[in-house]
């Protein structure tokens, strides 16, 4: 036994929650994860196969941080005295915060952030430019190029060979409809897991 207590529940909407109390920790950490990563570009929905451009999970990660009024959730977390971030991997996308106060408010804000999203042509176009610049920065890193070059040689023609952020070309192909469809599929509570430590 490692002496840890873990509380688990699954809500009626399907969201799974794990709580790991740490009495000797001053800071609280919350992370919500959806089972949607960069390899999820070919999806079967109601027997119908759909193909999406590489980088869509990462693009959606960026857009989830913007509320319906175009305001940045990062600033809302700062207002609560917490830090927040997000990341996309091959198999998941996660959003997180760390704080020393206002824990219920931070959890509520995290849940609010991943429960609704708003897209406009202008905001998607702006984000597309930001992500394309980000891709350029990644490609300037020798370690990054070596890692994804190895994956491309090991798994040619598969989503594992694609950059998690996509390519400049694939990002240009992502539409508002693509983003909305993937949000509706993967940001449902039944596809998500909340962990609070």
How would you name each of these model-derived features?
Residues 1-72, 180-197:
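His/Glu-rich zincin catalytic helix
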Residues 10, 21, 67, 72-197:
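Charge-rich, well-structured scaffold segments of protease-associated domains
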């Amino acid at each position: 036994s490692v002496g840890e207590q873990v509380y688990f529940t699954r809500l009626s909407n399907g969201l799974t929650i794990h709580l790991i109390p740490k009495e000797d920790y001053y800071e609280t950490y919350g992370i919500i994860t959806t089972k949607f990563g960069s390899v999820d570009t070919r999806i079967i929905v109601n027997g119908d196969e759909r193909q999406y451009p590489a980088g869509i999970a990462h693009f959606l990660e960026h857009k989830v941080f913007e509320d319906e009024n175009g305001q940045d959730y990062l600033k809302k977390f700062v207002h609560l005295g917490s830090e927040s971030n997000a990341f996309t991997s091959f198999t998941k996308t996660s959003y997180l915060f760390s704080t020393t106060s206002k824990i219920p408010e931070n959890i509520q804000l995290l849940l609010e952030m991943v429960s609704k999203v708003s897209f406009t042509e202008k905001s998607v176009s702006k984000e597309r430019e930001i992500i394309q610049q980000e891709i350029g920065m990644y490609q300037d890193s020798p370690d990054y190029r070596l890692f994804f070059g190895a994956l491309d040689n090991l798994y040619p023609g598969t989503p594992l060979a694609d950059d998690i952020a996509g390519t400049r070309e694939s990002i240009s192909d992502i539409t508002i409809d693509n983003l909305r469809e993937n949000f509706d599929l993967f940001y449902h509570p039944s596809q998500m897991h909340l962990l609070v430590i």
